[in-house]
Amino acid sequence: KDFNLEVLVRTTCMQKGYQLRSNLKNPEIYKNYNVLNPEDFKALLTAYVQAHGDVRAENQSLARRATFDATATLYVVGDVHSGITALVGFLTRLRDDGVLGNDGQLAATARVIFLGDLVDRGVWGAEVLYVALQLWEKNRDKVFVLRGNHENHSQHEEYGFGAELDAFNDEAIRQLVKQMCERLPEVLFATVRTERFVFCHGGIPHYADSSPVAFFDGGDGFFNTTEGATTSNPHADSQWQWNDFDLSEDATTRSRRDGNNGTMFVIGRLATAKFKTQHKVRQIVRGHEDTNSLRLEYVTTTSEFTINASTATNKLPPDFDKLVDAADVITTSIAYPAKIPSTTTPLFFVLITNKGTD
């Protein structure tokens, strides 16, 4: 509650990650690890719901739009997936760098963007959600929490977060979480200095490269889409949450993929490039899946790039801007805490500053 970060670090579930992964639907598991005060959790969820009144209708997407000036530094966080150790490690670094105060206040120039999938796949989803919303509550104009496909009520029953909520034995918490998730924006259209960036969890919709929608115009709110009501259901409500990219040389357009999780679209290189050109977008930054896009880590290896960044200085190569522009899409790293039984799992993120992309 007072942002004492060390107190939030609990390592038991990380050490038992493999055993837990096969048992995430059992509410009894979560009772062993819950450290939240339910009333504090409900108060924070209520604050978010009250601050965001409208829920999007069918065939609409909910967008945030923002302009960041030359002094802004953006910290863009990929999939946390209940990884409280990773999240606290990230916040601890911000604190140590003087970006985050012990009172939870971010520096005047700092902005934090969560790309979705905060919950599921581990036992600390509620704690991760609580910490992220605490950061938002203390910095409402500086923190953006986007909706991933795992911020979807139907997914919670499949990947563990539903059982975690059941462990509270409080239906009000479950309903507040549902209402909060329904109010999370699916995409952030941001102008960083004079350059346009798209931040989302999944991928651009299949119609986006030919869309008349002026994505970057106007303020926050809804915009109509041409995606059908069943396009991404039941897995997610929007293609911004669920679509993927295929950036191999022979993937030039888009394809439809039907599976157990519903229907989604895979966007190829030509459609991606056309979208970026049409809407004057420098780069798309997303999470969701490992594709053959430029994937950002302290040490990253892809088929196209190998980026070695010193873990001592956390500096990326001086020509990194060129790599960013050469990439079709940037994919942030994904934390799977239940697969990595480590107490020091790092949470990788993109840092965009007035000196370029670092």
Describe each model-derived feature in a short phrase:
Residues 1-358:
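Feature recognizes metal-dependent phosphohydrolase scaffolds
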